[in-house]
């Protein structure tokens, strides 16, 4: 009997310990739920919810410890819940929410719900930083450090981290200051991280997202005026920016063998200073010029515009040809709209290049002209251009063109909707429109499916496009009965779209078949 006491005590401790540990580690900010009605109510009242479903209480322990710290960091911005599917009371809830923890190696699932509906399964890195970043921007891109290829880049999160690295690092240090939305940064990141791996042990390459206003001091100190800005340091001392050099991994590695200050940029000679037969007009002399010349074709341009640069030689050749004619049919002129803003505003110039024709001082519309031949043909016989082609929205197609006012109500009526957010001027959008239109026509007889489009340039749609986290064109989102389900990132072709939608319908048929079997 003398030995029975300790054995009984040990058993009691073993039984109580898991429960005691969990209660000590789980934050009060994590809501434990077992009743389907409670979860339904919570999803109705909170618009950003991450739910941990676990096979048992023990299986959830590590995640709960991590999520307790996350809950504190996102307090007021997101909600974290826990459902123990091993608990008899919670099994019904897990089944209702389609949580499958039957595989032996699957102990937990993390599901995210937004605006009352399922958004996505959390499949990013299970770390404090990644989950916090996700809950602060559920539709945003993953952190750079989540990329397995970026393991050799030092990722800095705070000014304290930045100052500490400058103080301790003895090796040459190259830091990329970036913003998560910056497309040029995204294009350069794979090269930067490849260079970091190649230079491991010889130099340190670091990355720091300084888009937030909390980093204004750093941006001011190192002249970060745009993204990416790459700065070079030696023994904690800033020397110069990596600028006007190549952006490939090979370029970076080669440059770090012998770091040099930025190469001086050779300023472009303004078109007006190049000479030639094109007349360059200003706010001050424009009106007088078009009065004195009975036939004038004017090109409104911007120095940075690639299409303008491509068109300029053809425009110059046409001007020279007209200049050499004994009985010239007119003259060609140009206006730098970035300098002569009064003229640009007066003639509603919103894109470049834009052509305007003036006959005896009166303005006329001009069709699309881009070559010397077309310019000369037009000047010899200026005529009213053919009516413009109907816009996508004006064409008779099966695509639903939505605006902010009817967006939600229309989508709620369709089980599956693929929405294309676009801008009419966007070349990538123009390329994909025929494919998207053909897809809509292919499914026009299926009442549960729709292909819809939103013109984000329209004033009435700009708030909607911002709410839907549209950061580039075209962007494709899939909605299930009006609720955002996922972003479409597959092939932007008719085949890609139709395969995606067919897979959705096949899933419907499979679920319907299973229900019939159960009945």
UniProtKB/Swiss-Prot annotation:
Motif interval(s): Prevents secretion from ER: 516-519
GO molecular function, one term: protein-disulfide reductase activity
Disulfide bonds: 85-94, 182-185, 305-308, 426-429
Span of domain Thioredoxin: 134-261, 270-384, 378-506
Gene Ontology CC: one annotated term: endoplasmic reticulum lumen
Catalytic activity: Catalyzes the rearrangement of -S-S- bonds in proteins
SUPFAM superfamilies assigned to the protein according to its UniProt record, in alphabetical order: Thioredoxin-like
GO biological process: electron transport chain; protein folding
Annotated TM spans: none
Compartments, as annotated in UniProt: Endoplasmic reticulum lumen
Highest taxon of source: Eukaryota
Pfam families linked: Thioredoxin
Keywords for the protein's UniProt record, in alphabetical order: Disulfide bond, Endoplasmic reticulum, Isomerase, Redox-active center, Repeat, Signal
Signal peptide: 1-21
EC number: 5.3.4.1
Assembly description: Interacts with CALR (via P-domain).
Family under the similarity heading: Belongs to the protein disulfide isomerase family.
Entry protein name: Protein disulfide-isomerase A5
Provenance organism: Homo sapiens (Human)
Gene of this entry: PDIA5
């Amino acid at each position: 009997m003398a030995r029975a006491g300790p054995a009984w005590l040990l058993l009691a401790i073993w039984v109580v310990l898991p429960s005691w540990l969990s209660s000590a580690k789980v934050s009060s900010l994590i809501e434990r739920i077992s009743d389907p009605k409670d979860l339904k109510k919570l999803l109705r009242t909170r618009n950003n919810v991450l739910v941990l479903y676990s096979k048992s209480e023990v299986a959830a322990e590590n995640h709960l410890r991590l999520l307790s710290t996350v809950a504190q960091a996102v307090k007021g911005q997101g909600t974290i819940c826990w459902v123990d599917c091993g608990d008899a009371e919670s099994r019904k809830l897990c089944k209702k929410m389609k949580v499958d923890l039957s595989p032996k190696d699957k102990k937990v699932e993390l599901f995210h719900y937004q605006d009352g509906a399922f958004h996505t399964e959390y499949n990013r890195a299970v770390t404090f930083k990644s989950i916090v970043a996700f809950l602060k921007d559920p539709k945003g891109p993953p952190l750079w450090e989540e990329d397995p290829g970026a393991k050799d880049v030092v990722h800095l999160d705070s000014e304290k981290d930045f100052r500490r690295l400058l103080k301790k690092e003895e090796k040459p240090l190259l830091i990329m200051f970036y913003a998560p939305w910056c497309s040029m940064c995204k294009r350069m990141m794979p090269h930067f991280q490849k260079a970091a791996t190649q230079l491991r042990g010889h130099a340190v390459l670091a990355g720091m997202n300084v888009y937030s206003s909390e980093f204004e001091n750093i941006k001011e100190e190192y002249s970060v005026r745009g993204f990416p800005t790459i700065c070079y340091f030696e023994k904690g001392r800033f020397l110069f920016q990596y600028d006007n050099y190549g952006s490939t991994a090979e370029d970076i590695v080669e440059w770090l063998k012998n770091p040099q200050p930025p190469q001086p940029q050779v300023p472009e000679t303004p078109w007006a200073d190049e000479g030639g037969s094109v007349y360059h007009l200003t706010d001050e002399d424009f009106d007088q010029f078009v009065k004195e010349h009975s036939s004038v074709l004017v090109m409104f341009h911007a120095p940075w515009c690639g299409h303008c640069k491509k068109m300029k030689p053809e425009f110059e050749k046409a001007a020279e040809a007209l200049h050499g004619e004994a009985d010239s049919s007119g003259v060609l002129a140009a206006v730098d709209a970035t300098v002569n803003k009064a003229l640009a505003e007066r003639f509603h110039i919103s894109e470049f290049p834009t052509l305007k024709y003036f006959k005896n001082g009166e303005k006329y519309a001009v069709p699309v002209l881009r070559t010397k031949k077309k310019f000369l043909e037009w000047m010899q016989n200026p005529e009213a251009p053919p009516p413009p082609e109907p816009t996508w929205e004006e064409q008779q197609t099966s695509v639903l063109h939505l605006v902010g006012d009817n967006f939600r109500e229309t989508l709620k009526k369709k089980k599956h909707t693929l929405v294309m957010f676009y801008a009419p001027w966007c070349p990538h959008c123009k390329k994909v429109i025929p494919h998207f239109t053909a897809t809509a026509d292919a499914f026009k007889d299926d009442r549960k499916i729709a292909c819809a489009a939103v013109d984000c340039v329209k004033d009435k749609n700009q708030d909607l496009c911002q709410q839907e986290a549209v950061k580039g064109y075209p962007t494709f989102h899939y909605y299930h009965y009006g609720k955002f389900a996922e972003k479409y990132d597959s092939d932007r072709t008719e085949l890609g779209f139709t395969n995606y939608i067919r897979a959705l319908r096949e899933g419907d048929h499979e679920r319907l078949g299973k229900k019939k079997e159960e009945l």
